[in-house]
Amino acid sequence: MMITRGGAKAAKSLLVAAGPRLFSTVRTVSSHEALSASHILKPGVTSAWIWTRAPTIGGMRFASTITLGEKTPMKEEDANQKKTENESTGGDAAGGNNKGDKGIASYWGVEPNKITKEDGSEWKWNCFRPWETYKADITIDLKKHHVPTTFLDRIAYWTVKSLRWPTDLFFQRRYGCRAMMLETVAAVPGMVGGMLLHCKSLRRFEQSGGWIKALLEEAENERMHLMTFMEVAKPKWYERALVITVQGVFFNAYFLGYLISPKFAHRMVGYLEEEAIHSYTEFLKELDKGNIENVPAPAIAIDYWRLPADATLRDVVMVVRADEAHHRDVNHFASDIHYQGRELKEAPAPIGYH
């Protein structure tokens, strides 16, 4: 009797729980039908289907349709998980969990500004911009020479003269390759001096008087000389190896020299620029004699120095020689400032001196 009553109660519980599903007049809808009907009748509302388990029917599943606008435990859980991941990524990237932070996986693909020339055509160079171009002052005095008067001046002068002999022996009259080698060396002092002045400005919490910018401009100008002559002279493999060796030695030597005596370092660069003027003068003589072909100027040189479209290699050598004369003046001026017992910041730097 007790077993019969217990069985009846269990059966009643099963009927109450399963009745709405087993004895409902509503037809079960498949996933395909649910998606099709929802799209046809309610094009603005997207439907999806999920599987649900009956509470007391072991292993039985039924399909039902819901709209995406309705909240379900599964969707709320997914949304919370994504929110947590975004906050975690943003916190790792920004160093905190500030509200509104957005995690970025990569910054690749920053779009540059579109730049055009004065005539409206597209600017094709990425290594320099139109506002960095200029017309070289070729009327500058090329024959000026600083007479060495002090012991350091004489050391600087004869150091540069001693470097000329192996250069003449190696390159002889191959002035294109000679110019390439010269520019790989001449581009180092401005960068070293600007870097050391930059660190000094940070260390002392003081301005540089514009000399950081002036020296870095010099280094960039010399680098553009190299990029230009690379279009004219194609260096051989052993010349490239020589460039690596010479640049490595000269960079470290000039770095130490500038730390020990800036006035000596600038004086030596001034004499080095005087030798560069001499080399480019000889280059022009060979062009005028016809020993070197006066080929059309590279496109990069025409845009950088604002040369006419029909400019030739001779025009390029002329403007490069004028640049070297300006660098000569800047470095002798910097050395004179130090000789007077003053710092570079006390005298205005010749920024934009071309």
Swiss-Prot record:
Annotated effect of mutating C127 to E/D/R/K: Active enzyme insensitive to stimulation by pyruvate
Transit peptide (first-last residue): 1-62
One GO molecular-function entry: metal ion binding
GO terms, biological process: cellular respiration; mitochondria-nucleus signaling pathway; response to cold
Chemical reaction(s) catalysed: 2 a ubiquinol + O2 = 2 a ubiquinone + 2 H2O
Membrane topology: Multi-pass membrane protein
Enzyme Commission designation: 1.10.3.11
Region (Disordered): 68-99
PANTHER family: ALTERNATIVE OXIDASE
Cofactor note: Binds 2 iron ions per subunit.
Spans traversing the lipid bilayer: 179-199, 241-261
Compositionally biased residues, Basic and acidic residues: 72-86
Consequence of gene disruption: No visible phenotype under normal growth conditions. Decreased operating efficiency of photosystem II and an enhanced activity of cyclic electron transport around photosystem I. Altered photosynthetic carbon metabolism when grown under high CO(2) concentrations.
Induction: Up-regulated by antimycin A, low-nitrogen and salt stresses, high light, H(2)O(2), ethylene, paraquat, rotenone, salicylic acid, malonate,erythromycin and cold treatments.
Annotated binding of Fe cation 1, by residue: E183, E222, H225, E324
Protein name in the entry: Ubiquinol oxidase 1a, mitochondrial
Cofactor(s) listed in the protein's UniProt record: Fe cation
Pfam families: AOX
